A protein has these predicted regions:
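Phosphate-binding site recognition
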Residues: 1-150
Length: 150
């Protein structure tokens, strides 16, 4: 059971009804249910849900680790063959290629600040992907989710 989030569900549903793709940001303190809210929205509305989560910031984690984690998660969740990635441009292009045009889909980029923390080009690559790929899809919500320090 999910309690106390009806306003957020309504806002997401309103976005879902629009005839264009939507880009949503979701931020808040750690462990308050941000990712669960998005997953529950997808479940309630019976839409395809792809969750890609950045690796936690810790010693030894590199941009390549983040890219390969993205590739593995994408492969696992879409039933496609794992193929290593070398840059975020290619990562977002692969994601775009796996989002079906006729299938309602929610893509959650979770812990996005961790995901892109080692590549100064990450924000620009994400912007390019939104402007030139994701925004062209009319059955897509892309959610950028991150935690803030309390």
């Amino acid at each position: 059971m999910f309690v106390g989030r009806e306003e957020q569900f309504k806002q997401l549903k309103d976005l879902w009804r629009k005839p264009v793709a939507s880009l949503v940001t979701c931020r808040g303190r750690r462990r308050i249910g941000k990712s669960t809210l998005i997953a529950e929205f997808a479940r309630r509305n019976r839409v395809r849900f792809i969750k890609l989560e950045g690796l936690p910031s810790r010693e030894g984690v590199t941009n390549d680790d983040q890219l390969q984690a993205f590739a593995r998660q994408l492969s696992d969740q879409t039933g496609t063959k794992y193929e290593p990635l070398t840059c975020w441009f290619d990562a977002f292009a692969r994601l775009d290629g796996l989002v079906e045009q006729k299938t309602k889909t929610v893509v959650l980029l979770d812990e996005i600040s961790w995901m892109g923390m080692f590549d100064v080009n990450f924000p620009g690559e994400l912007k390019y992907a939104w402007d030139n790929r994701f925004s062209k899809r009319n059955k897509l919500i892309v959610v950028l989710c991150g935690s803030v320090s309390s």
